[in-house]
Design a protein with these regions (language model features):
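Conserved, well-structured functional cores that handle cations and Mg-NTP chemistry
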Residues: 1-124, 128
């Protein structure tokens, strides 16, 4: 989107370069219900256990002490992607309705950021990636 492109351009101008790091992580949001898109029992690192939650894959550009979040994508567990009725009822767009692992989502986002001209020296991620 134009907004994402502008965000990447500004972040690159301020932080981009060989000494910048692209940090890949995921964030879990605990949920009590079952209707929020992507909610399912899954590992929530903030809680240190499996819990009913939504999980997002994030990509942040950082140099020195300055971070800029450039990507945040919802992870859909197989319990969601294998249920076309649930996906349609929730309004999940067709391109996002197929199952992708968190590392696959991260690679798609890295490719998107590189194609947009973002410069970074290396990617940092935990063992889950």
């Amino acid at each position: 989107s134009p907004l994402e492109q502008e965000l990447v351009s500004q972040a690159d101008a301020l932080l981009g370069g060989d000494d910048a790091f692209l940090i890949v992580d995921d964030t879990a949001f605990p949920k009590k219900g079952t209707h929020s898109v992507g909610v399912a029992p899954q590992y929530a690192s903030a809680l240190g256990k499996n819990a009913n939650c939504q999980t997002l894959v994030s990509l942040t550009l950082a140099r020195d002490e300055v971070p800029a979040m450039l990507g945040l994508r919802l992870f859909l567990p197989e319990s969601w992607t294998s249920d076309p009725t649930r996906l349609a009822r929730s309004g999940v767009p067709e391109p996002r309705s197929t199952y992708r692992t968190k590392p696959e989502i991260a690679i798609e986002e890295i490719d998107r950021l590189r194609a947009a001209g973002l410069r970074f020296g290396c990617v940092l991620a935990d063992a889950g990636y």
